[in-house]
């Protein structure tokens, strides 16, 4: 579908197209949520066998705690497995308004986005989470306090620390995509740097314990990620400018 055809589409046609994409996403989520019922148990068992979990005795303080944890994992598995479908359907919805070259470029963002999400999860789970758990244990020992950890609390804290990091690692892809669409520019990102830094500091404070070292372990990677995002945005902006100039030359030549 060309840009001209997209411009000729009525509002009702756009709504019908959006409805179709949302329905596909909803059906995919239902399928993957059901799959989550089969995947949740082995994942929970695996996480209980890690060194961090083995050092703790996990308890159920309410009768429904194990069920809540199981359902929570099934839901998150459903969301994670549905995310590539969401990204593709989003691309399919906006791609008719893009040139062929732009469609290929934006489609390539999907695997990169998945890899960045996995990188964020890996960093938070293998580096940050063990450090935080060990830090909490040392505080308890120093205060001569016996920790009684609920299974619900343990996995809630684990997910609170890891999932947001996976999402925050999407920053370079999102900003590059917005740059290619002309919504933001690298100059704008540089201009709002101090506000972005403050926002990232607040986010880091929300997902980490009130302790300086763990807070810095989260904040520093996020700030570096923002600077990398600006560099990527600059490259995308220059490429978009060259593409626009080439299109103008072709138009003037005709």
Curated annotation (Swiss-Prot):
Its main location: membrane. GO terms for molecular function: proton motive force dependent protein transmembrane transporter activity. Signal peptide: none annotated. It is found in: Cell membrane. GO terms for biological process: intracellular protein transmembrane transport; protein transport by the Tat complex. The chain crosses the membrane at residues 24-44, 67-87, 112-132, 157-177, 187-207, 212-232. The keyword Protein transport applies. Keywords: Cell membrane, Membrane, Protein transport, Translocation, Transmembrane, Transmembrane helix, Transport. The keyword Nucleotidyltransferase does not apply. It is a multi-pass membrane protein. InterPro entries: Sec-indep_translocase_CS, TatC. One of its GO terms (cellular component) is TAT protein transport complex. Forms a complex with TatAy. Two types of complexes exist: one composed of TatAy and TatCy, and another composed only of TatAy. Belongs to the TatC family. HAMAP family: TatC. B.subtilis possesses two minimal, substrate-specific, Tat translocases: TatAd-TatCd and TatAy-TatCy, each one composed of a TatA and a TatC protein. TatA is bifunctional and performs the function of both the TatA and TatB proteins of Gram-negative organisms. Part of the twin-arginine translocation (Tat) system that transports large folded proteins containing a characteristic twin-arginine motif in their signal peptide across membranes. Required for YwbN secretion. This is Sec-independent protein translocase protein TatCy. It comes from Bacillus subtilis (strain 168).
